[in-house]
Amino acid sequence: MYIAGVMSGTSLDGIDVALVHIEGSGVDSKIELIHFTTVPFCNDMKNEIQQALSIETSNVQLICSLNFKLGLCFANAVKEVCKEANFPLRQLDLIGSHGQTIYHQPKQEGNIISSTLQIGEPAVIAYETNTTVISNFRTMDMAAGGQGAPLVPYSEIILYRHQTKNRLLQNIGGIGNVTVVPSKRSNESVIAFDTGPGNMIIDEVCQRLFQLSYDQNGKIAKQGVVVDEILTYCMNHPFLNVKPPKSTGREQFGEAFVTELLNRFEKHSRENILATVTMFTASSIVHHYQEFIFPYYEIDEVILGGGGSYNRTLVEMIRFGLKEEKCKIFTQEDLGYSSAAKEAIAFAILANETYHRNPSNVPSATGAKQSVVLGNITFPPI
């Protein structure tokens, strides 16, 4: 089957689309990436999404409108990846669309029950592309008592499980998440959870202090010095000591967090602040390994992926934090994979599993009561 996986993440840098060929289903699936592209959001669209993400500035009319606007954007992104690959759109079998997360409530707080909302109307995508769309992957896991995240572990089992090596797959998108993928000869369970901020705080600080969307290659952070009092403040965030399974998002590490941090530590230079929040991402990742993984698993390899793996300063900080450990550290590119395409490929794989009625959540990662088939199916016009 030819499937387009579509992902718009918490970093809001654009729409990632992977055109993938998949043979079979389940853990023996054969996956081939045909083409990958990122379609950037225009400034107006990015501003609308940011407005919708904030409780202070959002409203139901905006979210309702944005749902259809994003559906059209996702459809156009699918057309673009097919055009770039010289692949006829009519030959596309499925589209797996994650959507844009507007709010994610992994656990009940008072009368606010656990829930999640991703938008990007699948009916619009199906109509515009004349292709079946599978979307809303997180909701069934949450209906089964899970946190709806992380969902990439299933694809990571298929793509990265090694015959003899135990691996950690660390994704660094807007949020960081890790998957423990034991070797094929191991009887240990796959576990996965969010490790805290990935690029989210770094990007927000870049936008506010440098008027840049991100710190390319970590060049600015490299010019600064880590400030201990800021790092201590960040590392005292309660999320870091919550036991897995767990997930997080913009609600805990978004604009409100950065506003409080900048107000509290405004006396420090902007380069030092950026260096410190970059170290916060690295330290939160290392902390989670040392607290929740290394005591229970013998890890041979750590594989870094996502946009954050292109931040050389961040990667150096992670390497430094793990210098006493025996595991080797790689990036996706070191092993011939694409860091940028990883999550879009994952949702193509999940769409394939849903099409074949195969469960594809990992209850040991999400906390769900059982394995379930993920996603809703939207058919195109006849």
Curated annotation (Swiss-Prot):
Key word RNA-binding present: no
Reaction it catalyzes: 1,6-anhydro-N-acetyl-beta-muramate + ATP + H2O = N-acetyl-D-muramate 6-phosphate + ADP + H(+)
Record InterPro entries: Anhydro_N_Ac-Mur_kinase, ATPase_NBD
Keywords for this protein: ATP-binding, Carbohydrate metabolism, Kinase, Nucleotide-binding, Transferase
Annotated pathway: Amino-sugar metabolism; 1,6-anhydro-N-acetylmuramate degradation; Cell wall biogenesis; peptidoglycan recycling
SUPFAM superfamilies in UniProt: Actin-like ATPase domain
GO MF annotation list: ATP binding; kinase activity; phosphotransferase activity, alcohol group as acceptor
Keyword tRNA-binding annotated: no
UniProt-listed Enzyme Commission number(s): 2.7.1.170
Recorded superkingdom: Bacteria
Binding-site positions, ATP: 9-16
One GO process term, biological-process aspect: amino sugar metabolic process
NCBIfam families the UniProt entry points to: PRK09585.2-1 (NF007142), PRK09585.3-2 (NF007148)
Family note: Belongs to the anhydro-N-acetylmuramic acid kinase family.
Role description: Catalyzes the specific phosphorylation of 1,6-anhydro-N-acetylmuramic acid (anhMurNAc) with the simultaneous cleavage of the 1,6-anhydro ring, generating MurNAc-6-P. Is required for the utilization of anhMurNAc either imported from the medium or derived from its own cell wall murein, and thus plays a role in cell wall recycling.
Name of this protein: Anhydro-N-acetylmuramic acid kinase
Species whose genome carries this gene: Bacillus cereus (strain G9842)
Gene: anmK
